[in-house]
């Protein structure tokens, strides 16, 4: 059962943050800010209300993959450059300009291509690490397709690096997650990486 985001509590906390920053939450420009931020958080953190299993169930439409022998074939399905955004769990800073590429080797079931994009989007709607986004996407795609052979490549910019601290805009972070044959077969992993980039 999905968890519920406590929007009232978020409103109260945002109001307190405004006061702590030295501003007046009752002035015209800020009067509705706690409510607006609360609604925004409910939207951008929607993925926090669902477990990986619940996301798999929500976006798990598959098609039978008849007449396909996965033991003798390593044919890959690749969905490239899915745009997502997320928020860093360390600073609550935006992770943006993110592109997710997912590859898997079909077994008995094939997932609808749009569902892979929906899975990536929903996983991004959490307080996250980029590495965990890849791990969660791979786990969910594996749950849905029953394939243990999944790869995820993610690139993105992190607000905690581009707008604070070291302040290096344009710096990209790249992470990879590989499971099954992609993890154990170097040639297959290299082939997948060539296709994914």
Swiss-Prot record:
Enzyme Commission identifier(s): 3.5.4.16
Keyword field: GTP-binding, Hydrolase, Metal-binding, Nucleotide-binding, One-carbon metabolism, Zinc
Keyword Metal-binding included in the entry's annotation: yes
PROSITE patterns the UniProt entry points to: GTP_CYCLOHYDROL_1_1
Listed pathway(s): Cofactor biosynthesis; 7,8-dihydroneopterin triphosphate biosynthesis; 7,8-dihydroneopterin triphosphate from GTP: step 1/1
InterPro entries: GTP-CH-I_C/QueF, GTP-CH-I_N, GTP_CycHdrlase_I, GTP_CycHdrlase_I_CS, GTP_CycHdrlase_I_dom
One function term, GO molecular function aspect: GTP cyclohydrolase I activity
Annotated Zn(2+) binding sites: 88, 91, 160
GO cellular component, one term: cytoplasm
Any single biological process term in GO: tetrahydrobiopterin biosynthetic process
UniProt signal peptide: none
Catalytically driven reaction(s): GTP + H2O = 7,8-dihydroneopterin 3'-triphosphate + formate + H(+)
Top-level lineage group: Bacteria
Assembly with partners or alone: Homomer.
Family, per entry: Belongs to the GTP cyclohydrolase I family.
NCBIfam families registered for this protein in UniProt: folE, PRK09347.1-2, PRK09347.1-3
HAMAP family: FolE
Name this protein carries in UniProt: GTP cyclohydrolase 1
Organism encoding this protein: Clostridium beijerinckii (strain ATCC 51743 / NCIMB 8052)
Source organism phylogeny: Bacteria, Bacillati, Bacillota, Clostridia, Eubacteriales
